């Protein structure tokens, strides 16, 4: 009986917390300014921050702001698949890092307020969409680390790479990526490119305030790859060695 009461109380708290988070217009979400790194993890995340060239779909937008308010995204319309342009307040790239099987893994994640998400017949899309790249290195200390491999969001599943071409990497650290519509699934995905894209202000998971972390974790519609259970599972799935 005591356990049952605790579970009911916890469910009530969760529902209350979830109800307190506000969705706001995607154009009004304020990105976080890139902070001066203070740990090896943060310095490594900056060292390997990729360039992103937008070939298809929206530019990346911020997903959450300091007070925990979340992007409401954009409505997907089948007959209106043109790009939704840039956020007037600036863009964002998120990161989270950890060790996995003696490799230092850095996930970079971009949020899109709408995207093509077609599998099967017809055309379909999502109001919220994430793309991510996981950079695998041999050390959390950026002074001693080197790039070992990369795992990318693909149209279906993940694409894993341990042999990188020099034309896709700047100075051995900075990946050149692009967003595109995949052949399989016709979904927004990532792949390597020769073109030099843009960078966005980086905010790491640890640098996010508690309100923003909690909002991203509890909002099931956003389904961010950075939240605890997804991040850990994705590292296992993405391991390329």
Swiss-Prot record:
In this UniProt entry, which cysteines form S-S bonds?
none
State the signal peptide span: 1-19
Motif Conserved heptapeptide motif, residue range(s) on this chain: 125-131
Compartments it resides in:
Secreted
What the entry lists under InterPro entries is as follows: NPP1 (IPR008701)
Residues listed as glycosylation sites in the UniProt record = 144
Q: What induces it?
A: Expressed strongly at the early stages of host infection (up to 24 hours after infection) but subsided quickly afterward.
RNA-binding keyword on record: no
Q: Which GO terms describe its cellular component?
A: extracellular region
Q: Where is this motif: Conserved undecapeptide motif?
A: 105-115
On whether Heme is a keyword of this UniProt record, the answer is no
UniProt keyword terms in alphabetical order = Glycoprotein, Secreted, Signal, Virulence
Fill in the domain comment: The structure of NLP effectors is remarkably conserved with a high level of conservation of a central region containing the conserved undecapeptide motif AIMYAWYFPKD and heptapeptide motif GHRHDWE.
Role description:
Secreted effector that acts as a pathogen-associated molecular pattern (PAMP) recognized by the plant immune system. Induces necrosis in Nicotiana benthamiana leaves and can induce Phytophthora capsici resistance in Nicotiana benthamiana. Also significantly improves disease resistance of Arabidopsis thaliana to Hyaloperonospora arabidopsidis. causes an inhibition of plant growth which is typically associated with enhanced immunity when over-expressed in Arabidopsis.
Q: Which PANTHER family match?
A: DOMAIN PROTEIN, PUTATIVE (AFU_ORTHOLOGUE AFUA_5G00600)-RELATED
Family according to the record: Belongs to the Necrosis inducing protein (NPP1) family.
What is the protein's name according to its record?
NLP effector protein 7
What are the top taxonomic ranks of the organism?
Eukaryota, Sar, Stramenopiles, Oomycota, Peronosporales
Which gene name does the record give? NLP7
């Amino acid at each position: 009986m005591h356990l049952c009461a605790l579970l009911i109380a916890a469910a009530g708290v969760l529902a209350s917390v979830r109800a307190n988070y506000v969705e706001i217009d995607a154009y009004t979400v304020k990105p976080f300014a890139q902070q001066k790194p203070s740990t090896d993890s943060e310095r490594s995340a900056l060292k390997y921050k990729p360039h992103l060239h937008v070939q298809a779909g929206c530019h990346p937008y911020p997903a959450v702001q300091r007070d925990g308010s979340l992007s409401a995204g954009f409505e997907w319309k089948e007959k209106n698949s043109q790009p939704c342009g840039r956020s007037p307040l600036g863009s964002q790239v998120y990161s989270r890092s950890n060790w996995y099987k003696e490799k230092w893994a850095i996930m970079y994640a971009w949020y899109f307020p709408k995207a093509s998400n077609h599998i099967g017949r017809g055309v379909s899309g999502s109001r919220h969409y994430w793309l991510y790249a996981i950079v695998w290195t041999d050390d959390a200390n950026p002074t001693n680390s080197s790039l070992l491999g990369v795992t990318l969001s693909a149209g279906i599943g993940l694409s894993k790479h341990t042999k990188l071409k020099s034309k896709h990497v700047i100075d051995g650290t900075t990946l050149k990526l692009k967003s595109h519509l995949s052949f399989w699934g016709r979904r927004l995905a990532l792949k390597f490119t020769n073109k030099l894209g843009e960078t966005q202000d980086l905010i790491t998971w640890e640098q996010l305030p508690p309100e923003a972390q909690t909002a991203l974790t509890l909002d099931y519609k956003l389904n961010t790859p950075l939240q605890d259970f997804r991040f850990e599972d994705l590292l296992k799935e993405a391991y390329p060695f």
